Amino acid sequence: MRTIERSSAFKRDYKRESKGKHRATLDDDLKPVLTALVTDQSLDHRYRDHNLSGDWVGYRECHIRPDLLLIYRKSDTVRLARLGSHSELFG
């Protein structure tokens, strides 16, 4: 089982999202994804998990909700890098 490491940017993003439109469901939406990541299970197809390229090469992205993305990297730990909408994360 992997451990979770949260970047400072992720912590800031999580705080923002927990006060925004996803506040009622954020924890419930994140829990199954994080459980799958730490236990090395593949994510359900609905999360649209895929590799990133460019500045984010080596990272993966999944859709927690249609307009809420999680950028992460798996190695010995699961590093949560960013959380937010596509426009917030990619400009």
What are these regions (language model features)?
Residues 1-66, 74-78, 88-91:
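Basic, Lys/Arg-enriched alpha-helical interface segments
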